Structures are given as C-alpha cells and as structure tokens.
C-alpha cells in the first residue's frame, strides 16, 4: 500500500482564470484537527473554497484507553485535584460544567450500573458545547504526545478520562441489557471532501458524536456523508436526549465502499478493532506495554495533505 499522500487528487473549481492555490502539509497525521477544520471552514466573500483530505490513522492523537489502570487513574485525578486544574485553564468552562451538572440533576434519572455522576456530566458537558468540541479536539491532536507535554499542556485530563470510561461502561451495559454489540450511525462534514480507498483502514482520532438518524446527520453539512458501523461506540441518548452514539478516538474502521455524488462523497465504514499509541499516560506508564495489535501500520505514510483552492469571482 503506497503513501496516502500519493492518492490525493486535486479538486479543480470551474474558473476562467488560474486558481490561487495554497498547499498545506500537516505532519503527524492530525486528522482530528482536520475534522475540526471541516466544521469551522467557511468560504469568504468573493471566493470559493474546497478542501480535499486523505484519511490516515491520526497517529499523533491522544488515544489513551486506560487499559489495566482505570481505577488508579480515577484515584489520581481526584487526589491531584485535576478537575480544578483543568477547569481553571479554560475560560468559561466552570460555568459550562455547572450547566451540564444542573441539566443532569434536572433529568432526575438513575445512573446506569457502575457509572458516577461525573460520567453523566462529562457526556453532557461534551455534547452540549461546541466550543468544548473545538478546544478538546485541538488539544488531543497536538499537546499530549509525551508524558511531560501531557502533564504540562493537556488541560483535558479529567474530561478525556471520564468520556473514555463512560463510553466503555455504556457499551458493556448495552451488551448486557440489549445484546447490542454494534450500531449503524451517520456523520456529515461541512465544506470538506474526505477521500479514502475501498479496503483502507482508518480511524478518526477524536471523540466523534454521530447520529442514529440519517436525516438528522444531513443537517451537519453537504460534502461528505459517513455511514459508520461502530462496535466500540456507545449510545448516549439516555443523557443527551438525542439519538447519538459517541465513537472513541481509538476505534479502527475499514472502508467498505466509497461513492461520489453531486453533493459530495459517501463513505461506508465498518469497525475492525482498535489501536492506541498511549496508555495510562497520567501514571507515566509506557504505552508500549498496552498497545492493541489488530492492525500493522508500519508500512503506511503518516503524512496528510490539505489542498485549498481559492477562486476569485469575476
């Protein structure tokens, strides 16, 4: 399999003059940041913008599964008062957390087995605030690559652990109660064409909020629609009151099909395991001891390109 970058095809916009082209090379495959960019990108007045992105494994993303250390990490988060440290580092986050906490209390529901109030509030905190999505995704993509950098600069330790733990607990609960192992969900990007070849293996490298309703996913944009068969994601409707499934950053997917339509691309993905670079990072443990090995990726290039073409209106 050749380098992903060699597969990138330019998007040529109809124009009577040569387009102004800006080529951005992003090393380390920061796919979470690119997904964030897809949600923020807007054409400026007098120009048209198209972004073409090739998928990869998002290897630089912080993807800790806390395998074999979940209890110890929870204790350390409490003992080290990481909630206060994280909240103080983010503007307005304490108010947002309080709002999420109140929203959960007002629902008056019983917590699922083994879950705490903090798990519930973390889900609401993440799903109710678009600003949290942006900041969290950016941080996961860039500021947690070494234990030292993680400790010093990653101010989402509390949220990352409780979201990861919540997904894992809810998935177990769903299997025990309903026998449901996997879900077909949908996700749509804005102003971005994602490209992948049938048979390729990719992952998103971020917490992805997807919809169980295809019609609802269509509100997200009109460029690339993902139909995803996830087996590691978990439904969060009990908390958010929306038919949502949260997909963890470490889930791997195989591209089953890709088709082109007038309004964009349609990718069908099927879960094929999990992959983590980091594990028990808060405890300064070696990630090499706990890396799952469903897929060998040494031969793949981790270079992702974004090609932006801007056309001036005549």
UniProtKB/Swiss-Prot annotation:
Localization annotation: Cell membrane
GO molecular function: NAD+ poly-ADP-ribosyltransferase activity; NAD+-protein-arginine ADP-ribosyltransferase activity; nucleotidyltransferase activity
Lipid-bearing positions (GPI-anchor amidated alanine): 285
Assigned keywords, A-Z: Cell membrane, Disulfide bond, Glycoprotein, Glycosyltransferase, GPI-anchor, Lipoprotein, Membrane, NAD, NADP, Nucleotidyltransferase, Signal, Transferase
Disulphide bond pairs: 69-280, 182-231
Transmembrane segments: none
Residue ranges annotated for the TR mART core domain, each copy included: 91-276
Signal sequence bounds: 1-46
Membrane topology recorded in Swiss-Prot or TrEMBL: Lipid-anchor; GPI-anchor
Catalytic activity: L-arginyl-[protein] + NAD(+) = N(omega)-(ADP-D-ribosyl)-L-arginyl-[protein] + nicotinamide + H(+)
Record: residues binding NAD(+): 126, 206, 240
Enzyme category, top tier: transferase
InterPro entries: ADP-ribosyltransferase_ARG (IPR050999), ART (IPR000768)
Glycan attachment sites: 114, 178, 222, 257, 274
Residue positions assigned to the propeptide: 286-314
Primary location: membrane
EC number from the UniProt entry: 2.4.2.31
GO cellular component, one term: plasma membrane
Family: Belongs to the Arg-specific ADP-ribosyltransferase family.
Name of the protein described by the UniProt record: Ecto-ADP-ribosyltransferase 4
Originating species: Pan troglodytes
Gene designation: ART4
